[in-house]
Swiss-Prot record:
Record's keyword terms, sorted: Chloroplast, Membrane, Photosynthesis, Photosystem II, Plastid, Thylakoid, Transit peptide, Transmembrane, Transmembrane helix
Localization per record: Plastid, Chloroplast thylakoid membrane
Protein name, entry field: Photosystem II protein PSBS2
Family the UniProt entry places it in: Belongs to the ELIP/psbS family.
GO cellular component terms attached to this protein's record: chloroplast thylakoid membrane; photosystem II
Function per UniProt: Required for non-photochemical quenching (NPQ), a mechanism that converts and dissipates the harmful excess absorbed light energy into heat and protect the photosynthetic apparatus from photo-oxidative damage. Seems involved in the activation of NPQ, possibly by promoting conformational changes required for activation of LHCSR3-dependent quenching in the antenna of photosystem II (PSII).
Amino acid sequence: MAMTLSTKAFAQRGVSARKNTVRVYAATTKVNPKLASKTEVERFKQATGLPAPAINGKQFPLKLGFTKTNELFVGRLAMVGFSASLIGEILTGKGALAQFGYETGLNGIEVDGLVIGLIAFNLIAAVLPTSQTFVPEEQDTISERPAGPLQDPRITLLEPKKFFGVQGFGFTKENELFVGRAAQLGFAFSLIGEAVTGKGALAQFDIETGLSLRDTEFGLVVFILFLLFAAINEGSGKFVDEESA
């Protein structure tokens, strides 16, 4: 009888110990996500010697990869760069490549490799909107996204919102992705046109339309201001890698 009681007591102690282990493991699991985000900030500081970039007091360590957040950043750079090149062409009469050569003292032949790489990167980033799925964190959201022309060939320009992946006018991040992709394509093709013709984006536009810069000045100013505002406006909405922030 004493043996039986001691056996039961030992078994109860074992069960209690296992429960405590499970509780400790569960508590550790719940704490891990907070530690992970802190570790990312610390790793960024350790690798670069600089604090992680902060927006509204919240730190965002830079991550390499074709994510929507990075694509948004590249799109903003394209909008700012395209706008600046147009302003420079108005002031100097030279296109983006000629301005680059003037600033650096290099001629077009010496920067051919750089220009080709820049054009290729702009084209790839603009025409491969699904490339952000290379990041594992965004794989789970693919099924929740509405189909686009790459997934459903029945979607045509007759349905512009579905075709371009926008939901209407407004400074949302989804719409800004579209504007950024358009800026990347426009910048890339303007560089290709300048390499072929020797003329900047505005001069190419004049050749295509037969209109002088004086005739298109107002529309051009509105276009440049829109690109600049779209590039610096934070907009609304968030991406999958911001949901845990």
